[in-house]
Amino acid sequence: MKVLTKYLFVLLLIAGMSACSKTYFDINENNPNNPNNVDIDLVLSPQLRNIAYIQHMGSDDMSYWMGYWTIGGGSFVNSYVFNYTFDNKWFQGMWTSYYNYLGNLQYIDQHANGNNFYRGIVKTMNVVCYHNLIDLFGNIPYTQALQIDKYPTPAYDDAATIYNNLYQQLDSARDLIKNWSGNVPKGDIMYNGNKGNWVKFINTLQLRLILRVSQLTTKPPYYATALKNLLNSAASDGYISSVETEGNVNPGFFNQTGKGNPLVERFWNISQNQQTSSYNYYRANAAAVNFYWDGFNGYGDWRLYRMYAPYDNNSNHFKGAYFGVPTANNDTLSGLSWGDNVNGTFSGTNGFGIIKNVNQPIPMMTSFESYFLQAEAAYSNIIPGDYKALYKNGVRANFTYLYKGSLPDPSGNIAYQPNDAIADANGYMTQTSGKVNNFNIELTTDPLQTILSQKWISMNGVNPFEPYADFRRTGWPTYIYGSKYPGAPALPKRVFYPSIEYATNTANVKAQGEDVLTKKIFWGR
């Protein structure tokens, strides 16, 4: 841990770091300046950007495991990727990145000069970082973390105990922001100092964490108080419920190499005006493609055309491969649907799907996630509300998200349906044929399955962390297969502690017991 935290407070040039699970981010490569001279707004902006992106696209593995993507034919892949025999360095970048962000957030808190709006944002982002670390690894350093001089080898805290404190941190963050009447943070590139939207974000985040433990017989001690406070705040302040209240982060992306949205630049080379090699590396996963196709038994799930592209100019030619099943080539595998049309042209301004334009924001938390969280909580009698109406709003919001941006008539033989997201969503949800448990909340025999299935497909290309947690705590959706590589074990319930901890914090990491992928997180099944 000492190596992790040595320069925590001065990592100001990490905005471009993708935190891919396959890359070790070595913080010792940075040449830090004196942190005492740094404007906290210049620290806040990159933290919001990086925390949003690592959750959005920081792990290819979770997108594979959740049935969204697979690896294209012709790409060299070691078998350990498919059968989960990777080593302790595989998720090391995730660990080091989150602790780096936490250290920078602590710097903001220490230099806020009494501005409680900054402090409320810091507490909120701390919760995002810590809960994602727990959801991946289990027990982690918490109370002694970020105190390198006092605790060079910090002890690990019990994950459930940390969650209990995270609820309290969110209560505190909400109060700090609601009661603040002074200057707003200039570095707030998510809500531009809108207190009401920050409170909605906090409420939605707290509901996410409430649902994590909702099926446990014994809840964390502060759970009841947190839920009471959440219900009181939600009654007056609400949850994320629209594009305007979504947690979207944008530092000012524009059409220049290194300055565009990082997801877009992953697939589109701005300076060369062409696709990158990543476009052919990532292919559609059969689990998601087949789910979208189920809708075509009736009205049709036209999100398929916004998420994936036909592999040729026949509009019915969609195909995915299961992760772990080797493919010889990409000729009959769909890639991502992106740009201005399926033939690969991309102006950088008028796209659809998840790759719309170079200046699109990074989603931290979307309205459709919020609606599905509320729908599950209402169905489970945790919060008041009409779970059917909330579910329908979630589906509509996801259709709108994927349709947003222009959808011109493409060249070739591909014909798209009318660009009316709400009408298509409503038609999709009123189908009476096909696997109605997947989409019709009025006819389903298992509303929870329907809610979680739509939440899963809606998070495709948006946030694989959340469905990975849902699957481990509920077992839904059942058609998530992880890897179909011959002999591959069950989907990991957690990931290994990083090798850097074994090198620098040996006794404390070993005190956590056997470091295996089959050990469930405290809220897991």
Where are these regions (language model features)?
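C-terminal functional modules
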Residues: 398-525
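Bacterial Sec-dependent N-terminal signal peptides
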Residues: 1-29
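Short, compositionally biased low-complexity segments
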Residues: 20-27, 73-81, 137-144, 412-430
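Structured, solvent-exposed acidic/aromatic patches
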Residues: 37-41, 72-406, 444-446, 454
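Gram-positive Sec-dependent secretion signals
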Residues: 2-5, 375, 451
